[in-house]
Design a protein with these regions (language model features):
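Boundary/entry segment of secreted carbohydrate-active catalytic domains
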Residues: 1-21, 26
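Alpha-helical scaffold elements lining the catalytic groove of polysaccharide deacetylases
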Residues: 90-105
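Active-site gating loops and adjacent loop-to-helix segments of metal-dependent hydrolytic enzymes
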Residues: 73-94
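Acidic (Asp/Glu)-rich catalytic clusters
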Residues: 2, 26-33, 47-65, 105-111, ...
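Histidine-centered catalytic micro-motifs
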Residues: 11-16, 66-68, 117-127
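Structural preference for beta-strand elements that scaffold enzyme active sites
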Residues: 8-10, 35-39, 61-67, 114-117
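Catalytic domains of cell-wall/extracellular-matrix polysaccharide-remodeling enzymes
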Residues: 108-136
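Acidic-and-aromatic substrate-binding clefts and catalytic sites of carbohydrate-active enzymes
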Residues: 16-20, 40-50, 72-73, 123-129
């Protein structure tokens, strides 16, 4: 049990950028120190919330990560279809790489630096093939 006492839990809220109601709640939790960071949909994040997150990072040392998205949005497969394609190895790896690079570039253009961490919307970062891409 003593080894566990050296481990600290990091509390991260995901889906930041999906809608203003939840974004406002997460901003309040960050300001109050109730959570340690957020993972964002880089393609959905607006300028005002980008500014607020930058300020909180400066004043509260929060973590801001990329919430890698391959399943939510027009023209994207649902999570079941994506998982089937990943397991059967029929997933287009170039598409995954291009999506990741695009989302990282958007993040960097908004914040001026790369994310503190990366996770996946609907845990897609743990799917076969996708986990190999995000691990590189």
């Amino acid at each position: 049990m003593s080894k566990l006492s050296n481990i600290s839990a990091i509390k991260i809220a995901d889906d930041f950028g999906a809608d203003q109601f939840h974004d406002d709640a997460m901003l309040t939790l960050l300001e109050d120190g109730k959570i340690d960071g957020v993972s964002i949909f880089s393609e959905l994040l607006n300028e005002e919330n980008t500014r607020k997150l930058k300020n909180l990072k400066d004043t509260h040392s929060i973590q801001i990560g990329l919430h890698f998205n391959l399943t939510s949005g027009d023209g994207l497969p649902n999570v079941s279809e994506l998982l089937r394609n990943a397991i059967s190895r029929s997933l287009d790896v170039d598409y995954v790489v291009d999506s990741l690079v695009s989302q990282l570039n958007i993040f960097q253009s908004k914040f001026g630096y790369l994310p503190d961490f990366l996770d996946g919307h609907q845990h897609v970062h743990s799917f076969p093939l996708i986990n190999q891409v995000v691990s590189k």
